[in-house]
Amino acid sequence: MFRLFSPLALGPLTVRNRIVSAPPSLGLAASGGFSTPALCQRYEEWAAGGVGLLLTEPLAVSPSPPEGMAGLYDDSLIAELARVVTAAAPTPVLALLSAPAAPLMELQSMPLEPIQEQFALAAWRARAAGCAGVMVDGGDDTLLGQLCSPRSNVRVDDYGGTQRTRLACDIVEAIRRWLGPDLVIGARLVVDELRPDGITLNESRVSAHQLVSAGANLLDVVVGAHPTQPIAQFPGWQFPLVAAIRSLVDVPVIAHGSMGDAEAAEHALNEGSADLIALAAPLLENPAWPQQALEQLQNPPPLVDAVRPTRSMLPSAL
């Protein structure tokens, strides 16, 4: 069996393969964060195409989300998310719980304890909607991502300095304590911002350990931060940094990085760089990518024998 299509245990959940739909920002939600038929249809297409795990687009944990952003900040939104879960069935869904980024001046003094409760309540709603688990979003352009970064977090209280990941860990711990062991709790973290004043790999090694100790049984590792995110020049360009985190933790790790080629994805998994591969553009362009990837692996193109050039094949000028 190809590793890309082998099952994997994520705590209490076993997924059928290693293909994950990267959380898209579809902008298809209605005002107030409600789902729409177009939103449900997109998840239904990805599930039918054969992905092993679906990550929702970011779901706001607090009221008044940005226009087009889905939400999970109120009990009335449980039924909305349940429509997405039903559309994707039987493919498991993880709800990506997110707090949008805050203005930098506000970030330095805003109270953070209420945000922990907002995440925990949103996680409860996700489970009530039928989700297999949640992903706590610490990616760039999020409040938790800001707090984890030294370039944006200059707080001098218990959430600054060496404790920049405290809120993210407190959120994971609160969800685990409240909802118990039968829920997948993932944590998304920026492993390196690729800039001198940003998050570094050495810091992220510590953060990864802290998140797992708090109760995370899945890590979603991303590299770079807006607006310094480099343009990917080759498949799997993020994998060396992802592998550095995977070697330190005992939970599965998701990798991103323009991995739209099935053979390259299979090779990365076999090398141990990651446990799951997240796809964004390939699935947006072709929801049936998993099916075609399996066909590609089963029927690799024939090797072409190299022909040694002879003098007669060279241009006459030579």
Over which residues does each language-model region extend?
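Flavin-dependent oxidoreductase catalytic cores
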Residues: 1-318
